[in-house]
Protein backbone atom coordinates (compact mmCIF):
# COMPACT_ATOMS: atom_id res chain seq x y z
CA UNK A 1 0.00 0.00 0.00
CA UNK A 2 1.26 3.49 -0.88
CA UNK A 3 1.78 5.77 2.11
CA UNK A 4 0.22 9.24 1.80
CA UNK A 5 3.06 11.55 2.76
CA UNK A 6 1.63 14.32 0.57
CA UNK A 7 -1.73 14.49 2.33
CA UNK A 8 -2.42 16.27 5.65
CA UNK A 9 -3.44 13.14 7.55
CA UNK A 10 -0.96 11.46 9.87
CA UNK A 11 -0.41 9.34 12.96
CA UNK A 12 1.96 10.40 15.73
CA UNK A 13 3.59 7.68 17.82
CA UNK A 14 5.03 8.81 21.15
CA UNK A 15 8.29 6.93 21.69
CA UNK A 16 8.46 8.07 25.31
CA UNK A 17 5.05 6.55 26.04
CA UNK A 18 6.09 3.13 24.73
CA UNK A 19 9.36 3.29 26.66
CA UNK A 20 7.56 4.26 29.86
CA UNK A 21 5.00 1.46 29.55
CA UNK A 22 7.79 -1.07 29.06
CA UNK A 23 9.87 0.31 31.92
CA UNK A 24 6.92 0.30 34.31
CA UNK A 25 6.16 -3.32 33.44
CA UNK A 26 9.81 -4.32 33.78
CA UNK A 27 9.98 -2.71 37.22
CA UNK A 28 7.40 -5.18 38.52
CA UNK A 29 8.93 -8.27 36.90
CA UNK A 30 11.48 -10.53 38.61
CA UNK A 31 14.95 -10.11 37.10
CA UNK A 32 14.85 -13.57 35.52
CA UNK A 33 11.69 -12.86 33.52
CA UNK A 34 12.18 -11.61 29.96
CA UNK A 35 9.80 -9.12 28.37
CA UNK A 36 9.00 -9.90 24.75
CA UNK A 37 7.40 -7.10 22.75
CA UNK A 38 4.42 -8.25 20.70
CA UNK A 39 4.66 -6.38 17.41
CA UNK A 40 2.27 -8.41 15.25
CA UNK A 41 -0.25 -6.70 12.95
CA UNK A 42 2.11 -3.82 12.22
CA UNK A 43 2.63 -3.40 15.97
CA UNK A 44 -1.12 -3.04 16.53
CA UNK A 45 -1.10 -0.24 13.96
CA UNK A 46 1.89 1.57 15.46
CA UNK A 47 4.48 0.48 12.86
CA UNK A 48 6.37 -2.78 13.33
CA UNK A 49 9.96 -1.75 12.59
CA UNK A 50 10.09 1.53 14.48
CA UNK A 51 8.15 0.09 17.42
CA UNK A 52 10.56 -2.84 17.60
CA UNK A 53 13.48 -0.40 17.72
CA UNK A 54 11.84 1.54 20.55
CA UNK A 55 11.05 -1.65 22.47
CA UNK A 56 14.60 -2.95 22.10
CA UNK A 57 16.02 0.36 23.36
CA UNK A 58 13.65 0.15 26.34
CA UNK A 59 14.91 -3.30 27.27
CA UNK A 60 12.69 -5.81 25.48
CA UNK A 61 14.54 -9.12 25.13
CA UNK A 62 12.74 -10.36 22.04
CA UNK A 63 9.67 -10.11 19.84
CA UNK A 64 6.48 -12.02 19.14
CA UNK A 65 4.71 -11.85 15.79
CA UNK A 66 1.72 -13.59 14.23
CA UNK A 67 3.15 -14.74 10.90
CA UNK A 68 6.54 -15.70 9.51
CA UNK A 69 6.55 -12.73 7.13
CA UNK A 70 6.56 -10.35 10.09
CA UNK A 71 9.52 -12.19 11.61
CA UNK A 72 11.41 -12.02 8.32
CA UNK A 73 10.67 -8.30 8.05
CA UNK A 74 12.31 -7.79 11.44
CA UNK A 75 15.36 -9.79 10.36
CA UNK A 76 15.62 -7.79 7.13
CA UNK A 77 15.34 -4.54 9.11
CA UNK A 78 18.46 -5.38 11.07
CA UNK A 79 17.22 -7.41 14.02
CA UNK A 80 19.72 -10.17 13.24
CA UNK A 81 20.18 -11.97 16.54
CA UNK A 82 17.15 -11.06 18.63
CA UNK A 83 14.72 -13.75 19.77
CA UNK A 84 11.64 -13.82 17.52
CA UNK A 85 8.68 -16.17 17.99
CA UNK A 86 5.91 -16.73 15.45
CA UNK A 87 2.74 -17.22 17.48
CA UNK A 88 0.55 -18.32 14.58
CA UNK A 89 0.71 -21.25 12.19
CA UNK A 90 3.80 -21.67 10.01
CA UNK A 91 3.57 -23.87 6.93
CA UNK A 92 5.70 -27.03 6.99
CA UNK A 93 7.29 -26.02 3.71
CA UNK A 94 8.53 -22.84 5.41
CA UNK A 95 10.17 -24.63 8.34
CA UNK A 96 13.63 -24.38 6.80
CA UNK A 97 13.16 -20.69 6.06
CA UNK A 98 12.40 -20.12 9.73
CA UNK A 99 15.29 -22.33 10.83
CA UNK A 100 17.85 -20.63 8.59
CA UNK A 101 16.78 -17.24 9.98
CA UNK A 102 16.88 -18.44 13.60
CA UNK A 103 13.17 -17.77 14.02
CA UNK A 104 11.27 -19.77 16.63
CA UNK A 105 7.99 -21.32 15.50
CA UNK A 106 4.87 -22.54 17.23
CA UNK A 107 3.92 -26.22 16.93
CA UNK A 108 0.38 -27.11 17.94
CA UNK A 109 -0.25 -30.54 16.43
CA UNK A 110 1.74 -33.76 16.15
CA UNK A 111 1.52 -34.31 12.39
CA UNK A 112 3.32 -31.03 11.69
CA UNK A 113 6.54 -32.78 12.71
CA UNK A 114 6.02 -35.81 10.45
CA UNK A 115 8.60 -36.22 7.67
CA UNK A 116 10.12 -32.83 8.43
CA UNK A 117 13.59 -32.58 6.85
CA UNK A 118 15.56 -29.70 8.30
CA UNK A 119 18.72 -28.06 6.99
CA UNK A 120 19.32 -26.02 10.15
CA UNK A 121 18.24 -26.25 13.80
CA UNK A 122 14.59 -25.32 14.28
CA UNK A 123 13.53 -23.83 17.60
CA UNK A 124 10.05 -24.98 18.58
CA UNK A 125 7.55 -23.65 21.10
CA UNK A 126 4.78 -26.11 21.94
CA UNK A 127 1.38 -24.45 22.14
CA UNK A 128 -1.06 -25.82 24.71
CA UNK A 129 -4.79 -25.26 24.24
CA UNK A 130 -5.75 -24.88 27.87
CA UNK A 131 -9.14 -23.38 27.05
CA UNK A 132 -8.79 -20.71 24.37
CA UNK A 133 -9.94 -23.20 21.73
CA UNK A 134 -7.83 -21.93 18.83
CA UNK A 135 -4.49 -23.69 18.45
CA UNK A 136 -2.73 -26.17 20.68
CA UNK A 137 -2.34 -29.70 21.97
CA UNK A 138 -4.80 -30.69 24.68
CA UNK A 139 -3.36 -33.65 26.54
CA UNK A 140 -0.31 -34.82 28.43
CA UNK A 141 0.05 -37.74 26.01
CA UNK A 142 0.29 -35.44 22.99
CA UNK A 143 2.91 -33.34 24.75
CA UNK A 144 4.98 -36.41 25.62
CA UNK A 145 4.84 -37.80 22.09
CA UNK A 146 5.89 -34.45 20.62
CA UNK A 147 8.72 -34.16 23.14
CA UNK A 148 9.95 -37.63 22.12
CA UNK A 149 9.77 -36.82 18.39
CA UNK A 150 11.76 -33.63 18.89
CA UNK A 151 14.36 -35.37 21.07
CA UNK A 152 15.05 -37.96 18.35
CA UNK A 153 15.78 -35.34 15.66
CA UNK A 154 19.03 -33.47 16.34
CA UNK A 155 17.83 -30.54 14.22
CA UNK A 156 14.78 -29.87 16.42
CA UNK A 157 14.97 -27.97 19.69
CA UNK A 158 12.05 -27.80 22.14
CA UNK A 159 12.83 -24.25 23.20
CA UNK A 160 9.52 -23.31 24.80
CA UNK A 161 6.01 -24.22 25.86
CA UNK A 162 3.14 -21.79 26.29
CA UNK A 163 -0.57 -21.15 26.40
CA UNK A 164 -2.92 -18.20 26.01
CA UNK A 165 -5.58 -17.18 28.51
CA UNK A 166 -9.10 -16.45 27.28
CA UNK A 167 -10.25 -14.43 30.32
CA UNK A 168 -7.10 -12.82 31.72
CA UNK A 169 -8.68 -9.40 31.10
CA UNK A 170 -11.60 -10.16 33.43
CA UNK A 171 -11.77 -9.67 37.18
CA UNK A 172 -13.50 -13.03 37.70
CA UNK A 173 -10.69 -15.59 37.65
CA UNK A 174 -12.25 -19.07 37.85
CA UNK A 175 -11.81 -19.88 34.13
CA UNK A 176 -8.32 -18.41 34.20
CA UNK A 177 -7.45 -20.70 37.11
CA UNK A 178 -8.83 -23.73 35.23
CA UNK A 179 -6.66 -22.90 32.24
CA UNK A 180 -3.58 -22.40 34.41
CA UNK A 181 -4.11 -25.76 36.12
CA UNK A 182 -4.49 -27.56 32.79
CA UNK A 183 -1.34 -25.94 31.43
CA UNK A 184 0.66 -26.81 34.53
CA UNK A 185 -0.49 -30.44 34.31
CA UNK A 186 0.75 -30.69 30.73
CA UNK A 187 3.97 -28.86 31.59
CA UNK A 188 4.67 -31.29 34.42
CA UNK A 189 4.32 -34.24 32.04
CA UNK A 190 7.44 -33.25 30.10
CA UNK A 191 10.68 -35.03 30.88
CA UNK A 192 12.72 -31.84 30.50
CA UNK A 193 11.51 -28.31 31.19
CA UNK A 194 12.05 -26.13 28.09
CA UNK A 195 14.13 -22.95 28.32
CA UNK A 196 11.07 -20.73 28.01
CA UNK A 197 7.77 -21.34 29.76
CA UNK A 198 5.45 -18.42 29.05
CA UNK A 199 1.76 -17.81 29.58
CA UNK A 200 1.28 -14.12 30.37
CA UNK A 201 -0.13 -11.67 27.86
CA UNK A 202 -0.58 -7.99 28.81
CA UNK A 203 -3.63 -8.58 30.99
CA UNK A 204 -2.16 -11.57 32.81
CA UNK A 205 1.19 -9.88 33.35
CA UNK A 206 -0.52 -6.83 34.84
CA UNK A 207 -2.93 -8.70 37.12
CA UNK A 208 -1.45 -12.16 37.71
CA UNK A 209 2.28 -11.78 38.53
CA UNK A 210 2.44 -15.35 39.85
CA UNK A 211 2.37 -16.72 36.29
CA UNK A 212 5.24 -14.72 34.82
CA UNK A 213 7.34 -17.92 34.45
CA UNK A 214 10.35 -17.21 32.16
CA UNK A 215 8.91 -14.55 29.87
CA UNK A 216 5.86 -12.40 29.26
CA UNK A 217 4.32 -11.40 25.94
CA UNK A 218 3.72 -7.67 26.31
CA UNK A 219 1.29 -6.51 23.64
CA UNK A 220 -1.60 -4.07 23.89
CA UNK A 221 -0.39 -2.43 27.09
CA UNK A 222 3.02 -1.65 25.58
CA UNK A 223 1.08 0.79 23.41
CA UNK A 224 -0.62 2.32 26.45
CA UNK A 225 -4.00 0.70 25.92
CA UNK A 226 -5.90 -1.25 28.57
CA UNK A 227 -6.58 -4.93 27.76
CA UNK A 228 -10.23 -4.38 28.72
CA UNK A 229 -12.38 -1.67 30.25
CA UNK A 230 -13.28 -4.07 33.06
CA UNK A 231 -9.78 -4.01 34.53
CA UNK A 232 -9.01 -0.36 33.81
CA UNK A 233 -9.22 0.64 37.47
CA UNK A 234 -7.22 -2.36 38.69
CA UNK A 235 -3.94 -1.74 36.89
CA UNK A 236 -0.68 -1.56 38.87
CA UNK A 237 0.45 1.55 37.00
CA UNK A 238 -0.92 4.13 34.59
CA UNK A 239 -0.64 3.25 30.92
CA UNK A 240 0.40 6.00 28.51
CA UNK A 241 -1.28 5.80 25.08
CA UNK A 242 1.29 6.15 22.32
CA UNK A 243 -0.89 6.75 19.25
CA UNK A 244 -2.63 9.90 18.08
CA UNK A 245 -4.42 10.40 14.76
CA UNK A 246 -4.69 13.83 13.14
CA UNK A 247 -5.85 15.39 9.92
CA UNK A 248 -6.56 18.89 8.59
CA UNK A 249 -9.57 20.54 7.02
CA UNK A 250 -9.12 20.73 3.25
CA UNK A 251 -12.45 22.44 2.54
CA UNK A 252 -14.77 24.53 4.71
CA UNK A 253 -18.18 25.74 3.62
CA UNK A 254 -21.52 26.94 4.97
CA UNK A 255 -24.60 24.82 4.36
CA UNK A 256 -28.03 26.31 3.91
CA UNK A 257 -31.14 24.64 5.31
CA UNK A 258 -32.00 21.72 3.04
CA UNK A 259 -28.43 21.11 1.83
CA UNK A 260 -27.27 17.48 2.07
CA UNK A 261 -23.83 15.89 2.22
CA UNK A 262 -22.17 12.63 1.18
CA UNK A 263 -23.49 9.40 -0.34
CA UNK A 264 -27.17 8.71 0.01
CA UNK A 265 -27.82 12.28 1.19
CA UNK A 266 -28.36 10.81 4.66
CA UNK A 267 -27.54 14.10 6.39
CA UNK A 268 -29.48 17.25 5.61
CA UNK A 269 -28.93 20.60 7.31
CA UNK A 270 -31.96 22.01 9.11
CA UNK A 271 -30.35 25.42 9.59
CA UNK A 272 -27.29 27.33 8.46
CA UNK A 273 -24.17 25.49 9.59
CA UNK A 274 -20.46 25.20 8.85
CA UNK A 275 -18.98 21.90 7.72
CA UNK A 276 -15.49 20.74 6.82
CA UNK A 277 -14.17 18.01 4.58
CA UNK A 278 -11.32 15.89 5.96
CA UNK A 279 -8.90 13.88 3.76
CA UNK A 280 -9.38 10.55 5.52
CA UNK A 281 -11.86 7.75 4.97
CA UNK A 282 -12.60 4.09 5.37
CA UNK A 283 -9.63 3.11 3.18
CA UNK A 284 -7.49 4.54 5.99
CA UNK A 285 -9.32 2.63 8.72
CA UNK A 286 -11.87 5.29 9.61
CA UNK A 287 -14.65 2.84 8.85
CA UNK A 288 -18.20 3.90 7.99
CA UNK A 289 -19.46 2.99 11.46
CA UNK A 290 -17.64 6.08 12.76
CA UNK A 291 -20.45 8.21 11.31
CA UNK A 292 -21.99 10.08 14.25
CA UNK A 293 -18.81 9.86 16.33
CA UNK A 294 -17.06 13.09 17.28
CA UNK A 295 -13.62 14.53 16.64
CA UNK A 296 -11.94 17.55 18.24
CA UNK A 297 -11.37 20.94 16.62
CA UNK A 298 -9.39 23.26 18.87
CA UNK A 299 -10.67 21.22 21.80
CA UNK A 300 -14.34 21.42 20.78
CA UNK A 301 -16.36 18.38 19.76
CA UNK A 302 -17.38 18.16 16.12
CA UNK A 303 -19.62 15.29 14.96
CA UNK A 304 -18.98 13.24 11.84
CA UNK A 305 -21.98 13.71 9.57
CA UNK A 306 -23.25 11.74 6.60
CA UNK A 307 -21.61 8.59 5.33
CA UNK A 308 -17.86 8.28 5.56
CA UNK A 309 -16.36 7.91 2.08
CA UNK A 310 -13.39 5.85 0.97
CA UNK A 311 -11.03 8.83 1.14
CA UNK A 312 -12.97 11.69 2.73
CA UNK A 313 -15.10 12.49 5.77
CA UNK A 314 -17.33 15.45 6.60
CA UNK A 315 -17.73 17.00 10.05
CA UNK A 316 -20.13 19.60 11.40
CA UNK A 317 -18.29 22.57 12.91
CA UNK A 318 -19.32 24.57 15.98
CA UNK A 319 -18.47 27.72 13.99
CA UNK A 320 -16.43 28.80 10.98
CA UNK A 321 -12.80 27.64 10.86
CA UNK A 322 -10.04 28.21 8.36
CA UNK A 323 -8.98 25.61 5.82
CA UNK A 324 -5.90 23.88 7.20
CA UNK A 325 -7.17 23.78 10.79
CA UNK A 326 -5.90 20.69 12.61
CA UNK A 327 -8.47 18.04 13.59
CA UNK A 328 -7.87 15.42 16.29
CA UNK A 329 -9.50 12.05 15.65
CA UNK A 330 -7.64 10.19 18.41
CA UNK A 331 -5.57 12.17 20.90
CA UNK A 332 -5.59 15.28 23.07
CA UNK A 333 -6.43 18.83 22.05
CA UNK A 334 -6.81 21.95 24.22
CA UNK A 335 -7.35 19.93 27.40
CA UNK A 336 -9.90 17.54 25.92
CA UNK A 337 -9.25 14.12 24.42
CA UNK A 338 -10.70 11.38 22.27
CA UNK A 339 -9.27 7.96 23.06
CA UNK A 340 -9.13 4.63 21.28
CA UNK A 341 -11.37 3.39 24.10
CA UNK A 342 -13.92 6.10 23.24
CA UNK A 343 -13.88 5.03 19.62
CA UNK A 344 -14.13 1.36 20.56
CA UNK A 345 -17.12 1.97 22.81
CA UNK A 346 -18.89 3.89 20.04
CA UNK A 347 -18.12 1.19 17.47
CA UNK A 348 -19.05 -1.66 19.79
CA UNK A 349 -15.59 -3.19 19.61
CA UNK A 350 -12.23 -3.11 21.44
CA UNK A 351 -9.33 -0.67 21.35
CA UNK A 352 -7.13 -3.32 19.67
CA UNK A 353 -9.32 -3.21 16.58
CA UNK A 354 -9.41 0.60 16.48
CA UNK A 355 -5.64 0.92 16.10
CA UNK A 356 -5.14 -2.23 14.01
CA UNK A 357 -7.61 -0.91 11.44
CA UNK A 358 -5.42 2.12 10.70
CA UNK A 359 -3.85 1.31 7.36
CA UNK A 360 -0.34 1.95 6.11
CA UNK A 361 -1.73 4.64 3.81
CA UNK A 362 -1.50 6.91 6.86
CA UNK A 363 2.13 7.90 7.55
CA UNK A 364 3.47 7.30 11.06
CA UNK A 365 5.58 10.07 12.59
CA UNK A 366 7.62 9.17 15.66
CA UNK A 367 8.03 11.88 18.29
CA UNK A 368 9.85 12.27 21.64
Swiss-Prot record:
The active site is at residues 40, 263. Substrate binds at residues 134, 310. The keyword Ribosomal protein does not apply. One of its GO terms (cellular component) is cytosol. It comes from the Bacteria. It catalyses: L-alanine = D-alanine. GO terms for molecular function: alanine racemase activity; pyridoxal phosphate binding. Pfam families: Ala_racemase_C, Ala_racemase_N. InterPro entries: Ala_racemase, Ala_racemase/Decarboxylase_C, Ala_racemase_C, Ala_racemase_N, Ala_racemase_pyridoxalP-BS, PLP-binding_barrel. The modification N6-(pyridoxal phosphate)lysine is found at residue 40. Pathway: Amino-acid biosynthesis; D-alanine biosynthesis; D-alanine from L-alanine: step 1/1. Its cofactor is pyridoxal 5'-phosphate. Keywords: Isomerase, Pyridoxal phosphate. Its EC number is 5.1.1.1. One of its GO terms (biological process) is D-alanine biosynthetic process. SMART domains: Ala_racemase_C (SM01005). Belongs to the alanine racemase family. PANTHER family: ALANINE RACEMASE (PTHR30511), ALANINE RACEMASE, CATABOLIC-RELATED (PTHR30511:SF0). Catalyzes the interconversion of L-alanine and D-alanine. May also act on other amino acids. This is Alanine racemase. It comes from Listeria innocua serovar 6a (strain ATCC BAA-680 / CLIP 11262).
Amino acid sequence: MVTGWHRPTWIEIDRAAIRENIKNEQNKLPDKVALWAVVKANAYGHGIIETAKIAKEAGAKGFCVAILDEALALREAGFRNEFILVLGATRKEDANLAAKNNISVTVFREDWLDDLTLEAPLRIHLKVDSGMGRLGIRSREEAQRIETTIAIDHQMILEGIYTHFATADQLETSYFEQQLAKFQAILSSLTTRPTFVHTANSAASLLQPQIDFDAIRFGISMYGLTPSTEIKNSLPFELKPALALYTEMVHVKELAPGDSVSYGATYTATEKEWVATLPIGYADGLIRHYSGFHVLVEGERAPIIGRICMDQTIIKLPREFQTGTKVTIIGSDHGNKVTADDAAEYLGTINYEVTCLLTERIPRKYIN
